[in-house]
């Protein structure tokens, strides 16, 4: 079975080079902004702001991506257990409003947000949201154990039988990586939500793997929450790097239950959730 999964992985990722270059994360700084269990995070489309799902404060915190200073926030008057955020092609923000069993939709004007809609059909406890280049919205229902695809506000596809699914990230060729957290694995899905490949606990020692992002060469960066590390996995399935000691700690290259991951160019932002901070790295 393991060999079959490895073969599927390679078939699913042939668009990328088979050997990624060596990665050297260089610690830059940590936030001092008062956050409470921050989860996933996303740069605004123009790169000006870093939007952080601030779970314990029931809001989205907006930080300066360079200094990690707080600029603004929104949602604390109506969100509950905010877990994830993504943007569509025209800059609207979609937020996983987890404890309210919905994804809230906002028009964004600079650092101001206006609630304009929501998605809630067939999902409970959404913790991941992806705005795909095909125009669909993919939502991971952590409590409902499913992934739902919406088009024009209607459900058009669904994958069930999952365990606390979390993040969804689009690959260069339009496939989707999903963290099936309760099953301690990553799944590669087609846009129609068919499973194409699996990276499992046996091969990668995942323990509650959570949020993800992709480097330009297709390398996966994954927050392996309960192992207190960040894992870098090459397109050919090779483990390139484990960042962190594997024990809870605070400081450079130390984490407590890290979750959120965002990459832009050679800059990496991480949500060190158990330490209530955002950490910034340069990838050399």
Which stretches of residues belong to each language-model region?
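Short loop/turn segments that connect beta-strands within beta-propeller blades
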Residues: 64-68, 107-111, 150-154, 190-194, ...
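Blade-level signature of beta-propeller repeat domains, shared across WD40, Kelch, NHL, RCC1
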Residues: 257-284
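Conserved beta-strand positions in repeat-built beta-propeller and related beta-rich domains
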Residues: 52-56, 95-101, 139-143, 178-184, ...
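Beta-rich, blade/repeat-based domains predominating
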Residues: 32-45, 77-89, 121-133, 161-172, ...
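Bacterial N-terminal signal peptides
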Residues: 6-15
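A short beta-strand motif characteristic of beta-propeller blades
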Residues: 25-32, 69-75, 112-119, 154-159, ...
């Amino acid at each position: 079975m393991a060999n079959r999964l490895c073969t599927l992985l390679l078939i699913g990722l042939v668009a990328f080079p088979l050997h990624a270059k060596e990665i050297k994360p260089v610690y830059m700084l940590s936030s001092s902004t008062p956050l409470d269990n921050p989860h996933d995070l996303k740069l605004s489309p123009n790169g000006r702001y870093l939007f952080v799902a601030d779970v314990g404060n029931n809001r989205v915190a907006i930080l300066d991506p360079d200094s990690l200073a707080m600029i603004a926030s929104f949602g604390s008057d109506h969100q509950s257990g905010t877990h994830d955020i993504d943007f569509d092609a025209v800059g609207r923000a979609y937020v996983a409003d987890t404890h309210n069993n919905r994804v809230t939709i906002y028009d964004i004007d600079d650092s101001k947000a206006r609630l304009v809609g929501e998605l809630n059909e067939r999902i409970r406890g959404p913790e991941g949201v992806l705005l795909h280049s095909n125009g669909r919205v993919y939502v991971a229902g952590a409590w409902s154990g499913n992934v739902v695809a919406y088009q024009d506000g209607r459900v058009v596809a669904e994958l069930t039988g999952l365990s606390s699914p979390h993040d969804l990230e689009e690959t260069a060729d339009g496939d989707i990586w999903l963290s099936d957290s309760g099953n301690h694995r990553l799944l590669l899905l087609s846009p129609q939500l068919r499973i194409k490949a699996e990276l499992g606990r046996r091969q990668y020692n995942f323990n509650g793997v959570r949020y993800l992002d992709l480097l330009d060469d297709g390398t996966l960066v994954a927050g392996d929450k309960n192992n207190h590390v960040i894992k870098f996995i090459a397109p050919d399935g090779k483990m390139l790097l484990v960042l962190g000691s594997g024990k809870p700690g605070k400081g450079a290259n130390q984490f407590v239950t890290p979750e959120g991951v965002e990459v832009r160019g050679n800059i990496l932002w991480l949500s060190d959730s158990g330490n209530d901070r955002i950490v910034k790295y340069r990838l050399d």
